[in-house]
């Protein structure tokens, strides 16, 4: 098997969409926005991205119940390419673990 792992922390920036497949598998889709400072070649640089997330299966649905727009989360999983209705491809993070980060409030 070839490595395909991604761990990304970010803020939920689009409302969650819940669906159930014809096979009865629940899916939750949302988007997180990541912002950080990283070091590359000895220099600091700003890193930013928006990543669509798909959380499938009953176990992950429990993890997503308390997530809303503005929630800070760390998502671990694998990436895959999905074709949108307009024919364009986009990377999607398929969640295997979701951690809600306490804001401290």
UniProtKB/Swiss-Prot annotation:
A molecular-function term among this protein's GO annotations: single-stranded DNA binding
UniProt xrefs under PROSITE patterns: SSB
Residue intervals of the SSB domain: 1-102
Record carries keyword DNA-binding: yes
InterPro entries noted in UniProt: NA-bd_OB-fold, Primosome_PriB/ssb, Prisomal_replication_PriB
Keywords: DNA replication, DNA-binding, Primosome
Gene Ontology biological-process entries: DNA replication, synthesis of primer
Any GO CC annotation of this UniProt entry: primosome complex
Keyword rRNA processing: no
Pfam families hit by this protein: SSB_1
NCBIfam families named in the record: PriB_gamma
Function noted in UniProt: Involved in the restart of stalled replication forks, which reloads the replicative helicase on sites other than the origin of replication; the PriA-PriB pathway is the major replication restart pathway. During primosome assembly it facilitates complex formation between PriA and DnaT on DNA; stabilizes PriA on DNA. Stimulates the DNA unwinding activity of PriA helicase.
Similarity remark: Belongs to the PriB family.
Assembly and oligomerization: Homodimer. Interacts with PriA and DnaT. Component of the replication restart primosome. Primosome assembly occurs via a 'hand-off' mechanism. PriA binds to replication forks, subsequently PriB then DnaT bind; DnaT then displaces ssDNA to generate the helicase loading substrate.
Protein name as catalogued: Replication restart protein PriB
